[in-house]
């Protein structure tokens, strides 16, 4: 008697096989499968991650450029809003990556079609929050440029992207957003006034939160090594 596999198991095995070829950069094989079945990009594994998501996760910009040339208009075949079992879209994964050029490529392409940049996962975490958690300042800037709202709050803590940057201790990100990019971004973050200084008995500078609403102080963990939260400082920063 012929052994029959459940349909979902066959789907998982197939996507897993395609995923390996994406990871290895086998674009020629992928092109052949795409020509046979363009909807392959939306097929998912057992975790709900689509083939398009895995292309983004592995950072295969050559695969992306191939796909974008196949569509008559953005979103004709590729569904950028498809989410995995945790509610994450491809943009959530791209926001965490170091190479912001891949994120720019996707945003620049789907931005023509009004892609929802602020789509949250099931915990209310948006792509720009993911970028803040990982300290990806260029990714944050790209997402905001294409319409992401850095003041949107998650469902559990009520944190914005800026709160997450401070909470996770990404000192360089906070410094960068407040100083290097002060003009375009400071309007989004009115609760904080930041001063950076070197303490003689510390190797690294501290970021001092010197001006914000009282309820924000409760969000900052005391054990965070990069941030101190005080209401008043003397001229020596103590």
From Swiss-Prot:
Compartments reported by the entry: Host nucleus; Host cytoplasm
- Would the keyword Ion transport be found if you checked this record's keyword annotation? no
Instruction: Please name the InterPro entries in this protein's record.
Output: Ankyrin_rpt, Ankyrin_rpt-contain_sf
Tell me the organism.
African swine fever virus (isolate Warthog/Namibia/Wart80/1980)
Q: What is the name of the protein in this document?
A: IkB-like protein
Q: What induces it?
A: Expressed in the early phase of the viral replicative cycle.
Which parts of the chain are ANK repeats?
47-76, 86-119, 123-152, 157-186
Keyword list (alphabetical) reads: ANK repeat, Early protein, Host cytoplasm, Host nucleus, Host-virus interaction, Inhibition of host NF-kappa-B by virus, Repeat, Ubl conjugation
Q: How is it modified after translation?
A: The protein exists in a 28 kDa and a 32 kDa form, probably due to post-translational modifications which are neither phosphorylation, nor sumoylation.
Notes concerning its domains: The C-terminal region contains the docking motifs PxIxITxC and FLCV, which are required and sufficient for binding to host calcineurin.
**Residue positions of motif PxIxITxC motif:** 205-212
GO cellular component term of the entry, any: host cell cytoplasm
Motif Nuclear localization signal — list its residue ranges: 80-86, 202-213
- Per UniProt, the short sequence motif FLCV motif occupies residue numbers 227-230
Q: How does it assemble?
A: Interacts with host PPIA. Interacts with host PPP3CA/Calcineurin. Interacts with host RELA/p65; interaction of the 32 kDa form with host RELA results in the formation of a stable complex with NF-kappa-B. Interacts with host PPP3R1. Interacts with host EP300; this interaction inhibits the association of host EP300 with host RELA, JUN and NFATC2.
Query: What biological-process GO terms show up in the record?
Result: symbiont-mediated suppression of host NF-kappaB cascade
Q: What does this protein do?
A: IkB-like protein that inhibits the binding of NF-kappa-B to DNA, thereby downregulating pro-inflammatory cytokine production. Forms a heterodimer with the NF-kappa-B subunit RELA/p65 and prevents the activation of the NF-kappa-B transcription factor. Inhibits calcineurin function, which is required for the induction of nuclear factor of activated T cells (NFAT)-dependent immune response genes. Prevents the binding of substrates to calcineurin without affecting the phosphatase activity.
PANTHER family for this protein: ANKYRIN REPEAT AND PROTEIN KINASE DOMAIN-CONTAINING PROTEIN, ANKYRIN REPEAT-CONTAINING PROTEIN-RELATED
Q: Which gene encodes it?
A: A238L
């Amino acid at each position: 008697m012929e052994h029959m596999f459940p349909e979902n198991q066959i789907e998982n095995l197939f996507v897993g096989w395609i995923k390996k070829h994406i990871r290895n950069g086998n674009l020629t094989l992928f092109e052949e499968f795409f020509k046979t079945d363009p909807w392959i990009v939306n097929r998912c594994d057992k975790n709900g991650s689509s083939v398009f998501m895995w292309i983004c996760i592995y950072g295969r910009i050559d695969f992306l450029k191939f796909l974008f040339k196949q569509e008559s208009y953005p979103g004709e075949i590729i569904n950028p809003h498809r989410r995995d079992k945790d509610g994450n879209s491809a943009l959530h994964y791209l926001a965490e990556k170091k190479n912001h050029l891949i994120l720019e490529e996707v945003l620049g392409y789907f931005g023509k079609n009004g892609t929802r940049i602020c789509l949250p996962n099931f915990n209310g975490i948006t792509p720009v929050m993911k970028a803040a958690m990982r300290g990806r300042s260029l990714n944050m800037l790209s997402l905001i440029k294409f319409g992401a709202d850095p003041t949107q709050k998650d469902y559990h803590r009520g944190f914005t992207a800026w709160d997450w940057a401070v909470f996770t201790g990404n000192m360089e990100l906070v410094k960068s957003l407040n100083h290097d990019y002060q003009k375009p971004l400071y309007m989004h973050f009115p609760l904080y006034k930041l001063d950076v200084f070197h303490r003689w008995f510390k190797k690294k500078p501290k970021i001092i939160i010197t001006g914000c609403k009282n309820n924000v102080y409760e969000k900052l963990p005391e054990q965070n090594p990069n941030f101190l939260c005080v209401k008043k400082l003397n001229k020596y920063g103590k």
